[in-house]
Amino acid sequence: YRLFTFTCEWGNKSLQSRNIPQWLLDKDLWIRSKGVTDTVMAAINKTIDFFGEGIGVHTYYWHNYPYDTHYPDYFPAKPEFEGMISTIQKRKCHAVPYINGRLWDPAADSYTALNGASASCRKADGTLYTEIYPTSKVLNTVTCPASSLWHKIIIGLVDKIQNELHTNGVYIDQIAAAAPQPCFAKNHGHAAGGGDFWYKSYKALIDSIRGNHLRKDNIVFSEENSECYIPLFDMLLTVNTPHANCSIVPLFPTVYSDRVITCAYTYTPTADVTKGEFRYQNMQCFLYGSQLGWVDPTL
């Protein structure tokens, strides 16, 4: 299979040919900060004190509304967030904030103001695909990636985050993780139902971001490791590794390690950090060639 992947659109580019910033190639540790408080900033500083410069800080809960609600209305950012980014960068580390690339909350002001329903992915009966996550218990709609309105919104967010917050790029959640949905909307410019439009639409979006909006030496990355998205993103965050009733084998890195950068290995519950399992999982992460971490620094 590895040999076959070199003949595919997603597998025929080496890391060296993809213009990935050197700082990301050199990165060996990521932390996941949640919130913009003195406690969080103190934990980040303590982590940098211990591990040294060059840490990647993946920032969550920086936006105006609670997590997994009111997407894509992230602005205004919390007042202290720009200063937090600056502090991280002055310590010769890098900060990349979270946005979601797939969900639109129907309770968001923008959903009404911009007619978000027109961008929503539609089932055959015309109803919406909806999802509720335990982090918020709020209903979100799945947006069709072929929607030109959605492209405009995501690109606008990428521009605003870089221009106003001066980050080292943007993380766009779920794109490389969530399965495509058949869409029967008549206004999105694709054939009704399933097809490769899902991937091609996200490719067009990310290609536009990379070609016209991503600042020099900034990165864009996404969740999980669906192989068709490998060349679109500078890095893939692999954190949904299953554990129950299975044995983990490093199939993905065996096939793709020379063409993709991955970060992390699994979610790390708070209770596990002081246990042997945490060390074992980090050992697996290291052996499988993934950049270490994605652990809350306050732990």
Predicted regions located by residue number:
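Carbohydrate-recognition beta-sandwich/jelly-roll modules
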Residues: 1-61, 69, 73-74, 80, ...
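Active-site mouth loops of central-metabolism enzymes
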Residues: 29-39, 139-153, 270-272
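A cross-domain feature marking catalytic cores of carbohydrate-active enzymes
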Residues: 33-35, 59-61, 97-101, 174, ...
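Flexible loop/turn segments at secondary-structure boundaries
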Residues: 38-39, 64-68, 102-107, 177-181, ...
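Active-site and adjacent substrate-binding regions of carbohydrate-active enzymes
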Residues: 43, 47, 88, 149-211, ...
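Aromatic- and acidic-residue-enriched carbohydrate-binding clefts of CAZyme catalytic domains
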Residues: 56-79, 110-147, 178-203
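Active-site-adjacent "subsite" loops/lids of carbohydrate-active enzymes
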Residues: 79-165, 242-259, 263-264
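Active-site-proximal substrate-binding groove within the catalytic cores of carbohydrate-active enzymes
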Residues: 198-299
